[in-house]
Structures are given as structure tokens and as C-alpha cells.
């Protein structure tokens, strides 16, 4: 699976969000970054898709990884065979 439909929900000042962005950027993943503090509809979408409001949250198709660190992100990408 490619990363073409990858959405990363973030909030300003979130250190784990920055770590997630660096991880994805360094490995060449393409993703849409959405700041849920600037977009109320995106915040509601985040809650609907993930059942919570924590960031970072990564959504790829039907796969959702909420509130994660780099180890969980790496495992998630490998498990779902998501390539840059």
C-alpha cells in the first residue's frame, strides 16, 4: 500500500506530532498534514475516525493509528505494508 492517502492530524506545540512528521519526512512518505486547531471540521473528523481527539493521529484508508510514538508508527507502517 502506498502513502498517497495518508493523513496526519496534528496540533501546534505537540512534540509527538513533530516527531511523527520528522519520521515520515526522513523516510520519504507523502502525507496530508491537518492542524485540527485551525480546522473545526477536521477536528470533528479526527474524533469520528479515531474515536478520540489526541494527536498525532494517522489515518490511511480504513487504518487508524491514534496517539502514537515513533515505535508504534514504525510497527503500524510495517504491519500494513505502507510504503513511501
Positions of the model-derived regions?
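Short alpha-helical
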Residues: 15, 41, 72
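Local sequence-structure signature of Cys/Sec-based thiol-disulfide redox active-site neighborhoods
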Residues: 1-27
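Non-catalytic, surface beta->alpha helical segment in thiol-disulfide oxidoreductase systems
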Residues: 61-84
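Class I S-adenosyl-L-methionine
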Residues: 18-21, 25, 47, 74, ...
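Thiol-based oxidoreductase modules, predominantly thioredoxin-like and allied folds used
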Residues: 30-42
Amino acid at each position: 500500500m502506498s502513502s498517497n492517502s495518508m493523513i496526519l492530524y496534528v496540533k501546534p506545540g505537540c512534540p509527538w506530532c513533530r516527531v511523527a512528521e520528522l519520521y515520515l519526512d526522513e523516510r520519504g512518505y507523502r502525507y496530508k498534514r491537518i492542524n485540527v486547531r485551525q480546522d473545526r471540521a477536521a477536528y470533528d473528523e479526527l474524533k469520528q475516525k479515531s474515536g478520540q481527539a489526541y494527536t498525532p493521529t494517522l489515518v490511511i484508508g480504513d487504518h487508524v493509528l491514534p496517539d502514537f510514538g515513533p515505535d508504534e508508527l514504525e510497527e503500524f507502517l510495517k504491519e500494513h505494508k505502507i510504503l513511501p
